[in-house]
Amino acid sequence: MKRLFTFLMLQTLVLALWAQTCRTASCCHSESPSQWTGTWATAVEYTGQGDMPRHSLASTTLRQVVRVSMAGNENLSNCPTTLRLQLSNEFSDAPVEIRCVYIANALDSSDIQAGSARYLTFKGQRAVTIAAGATVWSDELTTFPLKALSRVAITVSYGKNVPTHATSHRGSRTTSYIASGKVGPQQKFSTIEKVDHWYNIAKLEVRSLATAIAVLGNSITDGRGSTTNQQDRWTDFLATALNRQQPVGVLNLGIGGNCVVEGGLSQPALQRFDRDILGQHHATRLILFEGTNDIGLCPKGQSEQVVDRLISAYVQLIDKAHAAGMTVYLATITPFKGNGWYTPFHEAARQEVNKWIRTSGKADVVIDFDRLVRDPANPDRLRPNYSDDWLHLNPTGYEAMGEYAASLLLNNL
């Protein structure tokens, strides 16, 4: 009788565990959020010869590291993340042949956690060729063990046919690793070249109930002055602070040397806004922090013209964002006295633009980075402990910016 009782108890326990497992699996399958939201993104651009690897990407494997913001599936803690990757060939004039792509948790240098590696497919196939000027999304991957604020490695094996000039992002602030031939996740990655750029990767999205914040900016947002491979841009600190409170995607669409209206490096903000900002799925908030280069590059004596052009451009971008249902956070332009392009004309323009940002009421919220980072004793300069070149911030300054921006975003949910 005692043995029968023990048997029945064990059978009941097994059935209960089996039922719980079925419920969990069913939950992962049936209750997974249907909304795609960005956890990482970058602004793609044309690659000049000086930013291409010395070795051709043809018949190589390229391992690139990115830091995500949120993990997705936040309400389903026992479920892996469902994700997809966008690859871009938008700024190239020839197709790019890709033999395979896999994603894995990143370790130090080019090493990965091999057991976490998952191959991506494109319409059911591992190989894909992206036409000149085009983008492709991978099929959704439902089994990746993604953690919020973690570093993941995206490994791309190229075929023989690649463009002379790849579509890239120059200011990755992380090292990418190139190996000869096709290298799988279990194989040793024998690096033949290292570059601090990203090639062909554009967006990583997860299924999530959360939304994302898109940040439009120049080199200060792109992380010039941060530490390579340390993830200490101001948007990294922003993502960390926000995700301590609740899941949210933080998408850095900054480009070094970028202008709002015209000139500078890569497409100006007015031209790239629809793709880089409005093209982000379920990005409900915009941080607009650009204008330094428009002012710095304008000829002496033209401060009034650049002020008028910048304000007109801000109005256009804010109106577009509002029409798309986005809340707009507009940031003041930070000081740059001590940098080579400073003159009283440029400072007058900066002050006029910042006055309009603070008083116009056009944006929903003002992020007063100028007031935060300026030297109280010399308000047309950055605080000495916040900058090493009097234009860009350093990690200390970026941390202050990220924490401050997070406080405003959390107070205006």
Model-derived segments and spans:
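N-terminal secretory targeting modules
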Residues: 20-216, 226-228
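Surface-exposed amphipathic alpha-helices with a cationic face
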Residues: 314-322
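Bacterial Sec-dependent N-terminal signal peptides
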Residues: 1-30
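Conserved SGNH/GDSL esterase-like catalytic core that processes O-acyl groups on lipids
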Residues: 40, 104-110, 180-204, 209-315, ...
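Surface-exposed acidic, glycine-flexible loop patches that form ligand/cofactor-binding
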Residues: 144-145, 275-282, 319-320, 411-413
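Catalytic His-Asp segment of secreted/periplasmic serine-dependent ester chemistry enzymes
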Residues: 296, 333-413
